[in-house]
Amino acid sequence: MRVRAISDRDYLNMIRVSRRQAPASLWIKGASVLNVYTKEWQEHHVVVAGERIAYVGEKEPLVDDQTVIMEAAGQYLVPGYIEPHAHPFQWYNPYTLADFALQTGTTGMVSDSLMLMHLPFSQRAAIMDSLAAHPVKQFFWGRLDPQTGKAHPSFTKENLARMLEHPRVIQGGELTNWGGVLQEDETLLFGLKHTRDLGKRMEGHHPGASYETLNIAAAAGVTACHEAIHAEDLLSRIRLGMYATLRHSSIRPDLPELVKGWLALGVPWSSRMMLTSDGSTPPMHRDGFMNSTIRVAIEAGMPPEEAYVMATLNPAVYYGLDAEIGGIAPGRIADMLLLPAIDQPTPSIVIANGQRVAEKGTLLVPTVQPQWDEASVRLADPLKKQAHPDWFRLRPDEDGKAPVLQMLNAVITRLSLEDMPVDQDGYVSLHHDPQLALIATIDATGGKRTLAVLRGFGEQLEGLASTYSASGDWIVIGRDPQAMAQALERIREIKGGVVLIDEGKIICECPLPLAGKFTSAPMEEVISMGENLVNQLRSKGHVHLDPIYSILFFTATHLPYARLTATGIVDIKSGQIVVPALPLP
């Protein structure tokens, strides 16, 4: 399929430029060009006609006074990078992320649509279609389940089909509801099969999966998985016909060990491997985007040529786009990067659609401006009452036990029922252990709250509130009910975001006014905002990899072992509510 349309006139002109019968629009002269098809560097001229490459070789093109000539001797030319697995709503949004990615050499992205699924389909489609005009080629995947444990009208058979059939949607997934597959959920299996019936790819989500489980996933239609933790996991996926994506994200910085482990296995690098930054939260993007991922791979011992191929040709082939993008060859869209050295993947110049669009990390062209006022992204606040400290007090059960969520790492939580001291009013007291806090999820629509003691998030944390959560429920964490209520009221005032209270004062405020989960602010501002929150939480003793992801995933029902939901604390393995939600007082 065409990634960008080409007119009959431009098509004929491209052929004429290739034959040296018409002048080139752009001539990149004398660069060392990476041939991703053979993994060799060649000193060639690259000749562009409009948006597309017309010629790659040793002969000089026909030029006129309109031809832009780039003297590139001593520089290295590679295709624009492709991010095959983006999550573009981690406080930032698809527009600001694309602008940022373009500055550092990413010219293609395949992105998650989960945060769009609460919108009417017409609005969802309008956003995806508007992004087609961005210099970064943007496609999406269609989610098959809401990842909340709650039914949602966007996830009926009819609505799944409508999303999957959209031309900007080129895969299904990622498949987070594996239990639904094993239980033969009719709607989920329809989505899996319909994705493959359409000839589209299907992304899995199988961390720690056995070879037997991966067999079932492949049989069900999964064609790739980004959840390999060890080199052997990569090999298992490839042996079963999947593509294996090597990940380096803020929550799973696995790439160095994957590379070293693969080298230790002594097997050749595979054309069925890709690289991803997998939706890192803003602070990690201080180091860049796909350029940073490639650099990590090279520093870990991956040959540069292999790293560039995994970030260009391989994802293009996987998604059936390699006749259009992913390589420097005639007929392809002219997305190319000039690098100062082979092992330095941050480009000095970015070319997209045949034009110089960024130089030294600065955008040179206007991109696409979102129309958020035309989308239903205002945070809903159906609460009819002011937050009260009593919402954040927990009584033990009749056996004197209280639910305790233990953070095993940044995203995995295990539930236990423990004896806890109580205060004079019979509420759980946390004064004996500074590492404890209370965590509450507020179901604003249903007027309910789910409460537990939280161990491992930090020390002496008075009050934090967040509308940024996987389920859309509001999360409040702290040791001081007054500060917790204050933080919750503040995020309602700013129409969404994350607020941290200490000694009665706001010490960190991160406004996320779009659906309470993201902002239209530019990436640099979002990165600084995220760094401030992380630094504040580190000062409060948070030791896990990524506290922003920790907050997001407290309500994500695709992760073990216990999660907070609108109906109570759920045991993920059994699907049973083990601690029911309570009404708001």
For every predicted segment, state its role:
Residues 80-82, 140, 275, 477:
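Residue-level marker for buried hydrophobic side chains located in beta-strands
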Residues 155-173, 180-244, 253-275, 285-299, ...:
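Histidine/acidic residue-rich metal-binding segments in metalloenzymes
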Residues 61-77:
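Active-site metal-binding motif and surrounding structural segment of the metallo-beta-lactamase
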Residues 87, 114-116, 141-148, 174-178, ...:
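Active-site beta-loop-alpha junctions enriched in small/polar residues
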